Design a protein with these regions (language model features):
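Conserved N-terminal phosphate-binding loop of PLP-dependent enzymes in the Aspartate aminotransferase
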Residues: 1-421
Length: 421
């Protein structure tokens, strides 16, 4: 079957709202390689949108899921619990940068984790208000759309959204937004929109994902912690995209001398299986009444088995160090490309959470057109890239951290040629 034929069937069978980026269909995948139904080979620098830090079908993940498949596939943890859920919670509690005793609850999607973090924060504080940041992305449910600071394509035509959500400014040195500017935006919210004693939580991504891989400065993160402590506000770190070795640490918050009260996780937690979680201070996590948290598929045993294997692989294969090594090489290649590609305005990131931003050299304005061209040319040469950014003018790199050196070098050669051309 040809991809063109299958695309016609897709258009007839599925709604246009489920946007599809690639015009080919995958048949098989292994580590950092995809093969489409026509036999073409693609180097995967998207990894299912940051889900495959341990690669496609890592043997240890596959083996763990296969073993669980022979035991049981579903009971609903709230009905009949299982040890693997408890032991995974224990592992996350030990690993997460939470101050004091921690507890963890598992869910299915990143948006579901954020929704439950909001429920927990409101239950603990008895307050309604939430502060988040422009450019942030937190999910596609109604509450998480309200929290998200990017309209297209996520929020168009879906309002009105839940209230008591306020957006501050996220620091961005490339665009001249300082930590002081960001903090002033919060002061204005407290003066104009909601009193601080009515705010349950401030939620942010330590590195914005969809927003363009903008890295929160250390002084900003410390100021948020101090602000939260002053007013009895909880600090929630959304680590859905940043977690599990992507940034060179198991969690991005470990780059800071700051500990959140709650932290959300998903994506690479379970190596391609749907699993998310919220970890936080035990007293905060215990605020909802029994039955207040859960879900039919929350903490599915197959996904939990995969997550145990993922944590083992990250430790055994030293993927945090690997992320630093690969990311450093990538940033070097991108910075060298600036000499021949005047559209590059910034190269940024931490570990292997790296991005390059493009502007029109003539006008200085964001150039989503050039960004799409880079993606197109890369795809023609067998390299799959993702874009992001409020203006769609950023390429983000989300390759598996298990990618072989030779394949990584090949991908960077393709990237360098595309940028030069």
């Amino acid at each position: 079957m040809k991809s063109s034929e299958l695309n016609q069937r897709r258009q007839q069978a599925t709604p246009r709202g489920v946007g599809v980026m690639c015009n080919y269909f995958v048949e098989k995948a292994e580590n950092a390689t995809l093969w489409d139904i026509e036999g073409n080979e693609v180097i995967d620098f998207a990894a299912g949108i940051a889900v495959l830090n341990t690669g496609h079908r890592h043997p240890k993940v596959v083996a763990a899921v296969a073993e669980q498949l022979q035991a049981f596939t579903h009971t609903a943890y709230q009905i009949v619990p299982y040890e693997s859920y408890v032991s995974l919670a224990e592992r996350i509690n030990d690993l997460a940068p939470i101050d004091g005793p921690a507890k963890t609850a598992f869910f299915t999607t990143g948006a579901e984790a954020v929704e439950n973090a909001v429920k927990i924060a409101r239950a603990y504080t008895g307050r309604p208000g939430l502060i988040t940041f422009g450019g942030g992305f937190h999910g596609r449910t109604f509450m998480t759309m309200a929290l998200t600071g990017k309209v297209a394509p996520y929020k168009i035509g879906f309002g009105p959204f839940p209230g008591s959500v306020y957006h501050g400014v996220y620091p961005n040195a490339t665009h001249g937004v300082t930590t002081a500017d960001a903090l002033k935006s919060l002061e204005r919210i407290f003066k104009a929109d909601i009193a601080p004693d009515q705010v349950a939580a401030i939620i942010l991504e330590p590195i914005q994902g969809e927003g363009g891989f903008n890295v929160a400065p250390a002084d900003f993160m410390q100021a948020l912690r101090d602000l939260c402590d002053t007013h009895g506000i909880l600090l929630i770190a959304d680590e859905v995209q940043t977690g599990f070795a992507r940034t060179g640490k198991l969690f991005a918050m470990q780059h800071y001398e700051v500990k959140p009260d709650l932290m959300t996780m998903a994506k690479s937690l379970a190596g391609g299986f749907p699993l998310s979680g919220v970890v936080g201070r035990a007293e905060v996590m215990d605020a909802p009444a029994p039955g207040g948290l859960g879900g039919t598929y929350a903490g599915n045993p197959l996904a939990v088995a995969a997550a145990h294997a993922v944590l083992d692989v990250i430790a055994e294969e030293q993927l945090c160090q690997r992320a630093e090594q690969l990311g450093s090489h990538l940033q070097e290649v991108l910075n060298q490309a600036r000499a021949t590609c005047p559209a590059i305005v910034d190269v940024r990131g931490r570990g292997s959470m790296v991005a390059v931003e493009f502007n029109d050299p003539q006008t200085g304005e964001p150039s989503p057109e050039f960004t799409r061209l880079v993606q197109q040319k890369a795809q023609e040469n067998g390299l799959l890239l993702l874009s992001c950014g409020v203006y769609g003018n950023v390429i983000r790199f989300l390759y598996p951290l298990t990618i072989p050196d030779a394949q990584f070098s090949k991908a960077l050669d393709i990237l360098a040629r595309v940028l030069k051309s």
